[in-house]
Amino acid sequence: MPTSNEVPTFPGLEDPNVIPHDGLQIKKQFPAVDANNPVWGVGGALLVWIASILVQAIIPLLFIVPFALHRGLNPSSPDFGRAALELAVTDPTAIFLQVLSILPTHILTLALLWAFVTRFGKRPFLASFGWGWSRSLGVFEGAALVGLGVLLFGVGVMLATLLGADKPTKLEQLINSSTGARYVIAALAVFTAPFVEEFVYRGVVYSALQRAVGVKAAVVFVLGLFTLIHVPQYSPNIGVLSAVALLSIVLTIIRAYTGRLLPCVVIHMSFNAVQAVLLVFEPYVQRLLPATPPPAPTASMLLPLIRIIF
């Protein structure tokens, strides 16, 4: 029976922000935060961006190199690099492993972001990005944002078609080379990629830039950075890259207007969800159409593995 000075608790349901002290439970207090006035600067934000790129380039190697050794490749051979590269772009299992490696890459990137933003738990994480619904609309804002994400996807498809979307992208070649890769990419696009990408670009990078150089310059810079990093995935298709640029500028403007990151994540997630559904059901639709031979794998297909994020 708790005394008048005690707050009853239940095993497994303790609040991680509550600190027990002499029979009392004291709520852990974080300093006040402003999403438009972060504690980090432009230099730190760009270092985090570079670190996220390096993580996404290195982690896949930890999967493909052991697989190459398992397949009998000799690491002391002068042709090991060439043979491993050939294996990576021709073997369906190797391709699947590289795509699968994006999940721990996302987890590690989120851990890096948490350490950077919170100073290892000294500051709140989500609140630092402006995480919340509109005070006037509440959760109804979510439904509107989902609709906007779906609408943006439709506009993006029309834009890509208008500018030429008939050229197969490197990402499409990668997806068509492995059934397992198709499903993993679809799942990552919905459940992890929107968080990682928004936290990095419109969370860490934009918030520091808008304070240093102003909103307009920050929007343009993030637009360029976001579009540039998708070039390896979607080249040489200018239409698809234009659709990516459209998504980026809308998301960044919404972040600038609302001062909150949650709307960007919801829109990004719904945009990706439409693409993921189409990705999953595409093979079944293709069975009803005349068969066309898939493009031959090339070394350039490895470039999208640096950034399997829609």
Predicted segments, located by residue:
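N-terminal, membrane-interfacial amphipathic/helix-forming hydrophobic leader that caps
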Residues: 1-128, 276-310
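Short amphipathic alpha-helical coupling elements at transmembrane boundaries
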Residues: 127-134, 206-211
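Residue-level signature of transmembrane alpha-helical cores of multipass secondary-active transporters
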Residues: 45, 49, 98, 141-146, ...
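Juxtamembrane loop-transmembrane helix junctions in multi-pass integral membrane proteins
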Residues: 89, 93, 132, 176-179, ...
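Transmembrane helix-loop-helix hairpins at the membrane interface
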Residues: 6-12, 26-29, 150-156, 161-310
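Interfacial segments of alpha-helical transmembrane regions
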Residues: 130-151
